[in-house]
Amino acid sequence: MAIHINIIGAGNMAYQLTQAFHNHPEVQLQQLYNRSELSPEFNVFEIEKIHHLSTLRPADVCIIAVKDEAIAEISKKLPFENQLVVHTSGNTSIEAIDSKNRRGVFYPLQTMNKQTLVDFTKVPFCLEAENTNDFHLLQRLASLLSTKIYALNSYQRRVLHLAAVFINNFSNHLVYISEQICKENEVPFEILQPLLTETFTKLQNTSAYDAQTGPARRNDSLTIGNHLAMLDNNNYKEIYEIITNSIINTYGRKEL
């Protein structure tokens, strides 16, 4: 029997989940809600699209895929009770959902946008529910997309989200800084692409502690000093110093 779901939201998460579920033979995607008009990317989905929460019908799972700060308000306005309502946030407690409904979390841990389709077979799903039957339903729903399924409570999920920010968001910003340094000095950034690939490929099989290399790992003060002298951007210089000192401290050396 198909799992009937509704999706609330029109951002990257809502788009990717809609894309994954809308033609799945074991899922009936009933309704897609957003307060305002949906972006053109959603036009390809032959689903009932609504703009008033009062017209949202009950479903086996109602997925709230919106910004963290909007979860509580939307959950209070849902026009039904005692239904399974979940959010998709890594950083928000299950208790953000109004208690008039059965609460849960359906969190796929992956960076998302509307330009690149997510291969959910490679994505871990972190699940939480207040009762066993609801957890099993979320487990079944997640298993339609992935075999990587984890039961995490709200605190564990927030810890995971924090760690993910370091891996994904901060590392991406460091790559951006590298791009800017190359651009400002007319050096082709493409030269660094193989290094970028190797850095993250190596971490699939080696701990970050063991994989660390570079001047800070060697405590090469001459190279570090030369790099700092080359950085005219004070923000970049501060980031370089903070990360360098963190690496030095990690391996038991004295700070700069």
Segments from the language model and where they lie:
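Interdomain hinge/lid region at the active-site interface
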Residues: 199-256
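Amphipathic, non-transmembrane alpha-helical scaffold segments
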Residues: 63, 164-167, 171, 240, ...
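NAD(P)+-binding Rossmann beta1-loop-alpha1 motif at the extreme N-terminus of oxidoreductases
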Residues: 1-53
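Internal alpha-helical scaffold of NAD(P)-dependent oxidoreductase catalytic cores
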Residues: 17, 40, 102, 117-159, ...
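Short, well-ordered alpha-helices that flank and scaffold nucleotide-derived cofactor binding pockets
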Residues: 15, 19-23, 76, 229, ...
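Rossmann-like NAD(P)(H) cofactor-binding subdomain of soluble oxidoreductases
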Residues: 17, 35-117
